[in-house]
Amino acid sequence: MNEETKQFVGTWELQAWSVVNVGSGKKRHAYGGNAVGHIMYTADGWVSATLMETGRKAVSDDRNTIQALKRSILEHPAGPLDSDQMDLMRQFYLACTGYVAYCGPFDVADGEVHHRVREALMPQMIDTTLTRKYQFVEDRLTLTATTRDMQDQLIWRRHD
């Protein structure tokens, strides 16, 4: 592992996450500024990231109810759901859209870190590469990514 890559190894705690609309220049904070998270880089070249919106409401943990809803959706994709099922869907939608999680190998080259996603909460992230420009200042790591018309900047502090 080269010196550039070694700088990443360890656990980092999210300090700030801002999102800028590239076209308008309008800046906002992800999850209304209520984001927490950690990113871990291992010496054997893996990254694991979890970020979440604080204050998310708890959802049902009744496995039978959850499995019944899943079966209903899979067996009748266009079929109607009753009001209890719709409420449960709403709860899970809100919980999932307030959470980001992925892991996979990473590599560093030319001022960028590449997260090669193998597993993720959101299936569309699997088998993609998330490229971030990076900067180290003291105990801080800033990762910046531009996708379509948005630029995300995440500031992490090395966790002791």
Tell what function each PLM region has.
Residues 1-160:
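Lipid interaction determinants
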